[in-house]
Amino acid sequence: MNIANTQIQMRKGILEYCVLHIISRGEVYTSDLIEELTQSQMIVVEGTLYPLLNRLKTAELVDYRWVESESGPPRKYYSITEKGKTFLSTLSETWASLVSSATQITTKN
C-alpha cells in the first residue's frame, strides 16, 4: 500500500468542503482558491479544482460571474448560493462529527 495515495485520497475527501468554505467567505477568483489550497497543502494538482468547481456549479451550490481584466482575458469569480450555504452547513456538522469520532478513536490507548 502506498502512503502517498492514501494521503491524496484523504485530501480529496474533504476538498469539496474546503472549497465551499473558502467561497463562502466572499467572491473568489480561481487563482486565489488555488493559492489558498496550495498553501494549506490541500491541493497538489490544479487540474483537480476545475472539475470540482464545475460539479459545484452544476449542483447549483456555487455561481460565478465574469469580470473584465485590465491585463488579459476576463476572470471568473465564484460565489456561494443559498443552496450552497445550506449544503455547507450540513457538511460542517458532518465534519465536526467526523473529527470528534476520529479523535475519540485515535486517542484511545
Residue spans of the language-model regions?
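Basic amphipathic alpha-helical segments that dock to polyanions
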Residues: 49-51, 55-56
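Amphipathic alpha-helical dimerization/coiled-coil segments
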Residues: 86-109
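Basic, amphipathic "hinge/linker" alpha-helix immediately C-terminal to the N-terminal HTH DNA-binding motif
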Residues: 70, 74-92
